[in-house]
């Protein structure tokens, strides 16, 4: 799980995100349908703080990261999100905040789902 935090993120966004991650049915059931959550399959979460997800490339050729949260706030929200996930019964492993890390991931199938707390309150 790659996590980007904005300065607008707080307890409401943390709770919503943790609940979604714990309960999203994104793993296949016995019939091959995405019908099982990470909790259902006994999975774990690798949580990586990734401010570059807020990279804005609409202008120029150098990304702007002004939408990313200030480091102290971002670290606090990221850690609180990980604790909220643990509160849902998940095992959470963490990367190091603000560190240069090599992280490998394998997308299993054509599924990547962004969760954006800025859209959580919009009507469907």
Mark where each language-model region is:
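Short Lys/Arg-rich amphipathic alpha-helical segments
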Residues: 1-91, 108, 112-114, 119-124
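Beta-rich nucleic-acid/ligand-interaction surfaces
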Residues: 99-104
């Amino acid at each position: 799980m790659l996590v980007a935090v904005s300065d607008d993120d707080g307890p409401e966004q943390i709770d919503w995100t943790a609940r979604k991650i714990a309960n999203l049915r994104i793993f296949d059931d016995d019939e091959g349908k995405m019908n099982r959550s990470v909790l259902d399959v006994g999975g774990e979460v690798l949580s990586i703080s990734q401010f570059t997800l807020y990279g804005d490339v609409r202008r120029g050729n150098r990304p702007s990261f002004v939408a990313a949260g200030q480091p102290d706030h971002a670290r606090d929200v990221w850690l609180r999100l990980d604790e909220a996930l643990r509160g849902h019964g998940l095992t959470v492993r963490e990367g190091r905040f603000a560190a240069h890390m090599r992280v490998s991931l394998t997308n299993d199938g054509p599924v990547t789902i962004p969760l954006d707390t800025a859209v959580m309150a919009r009507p469907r």
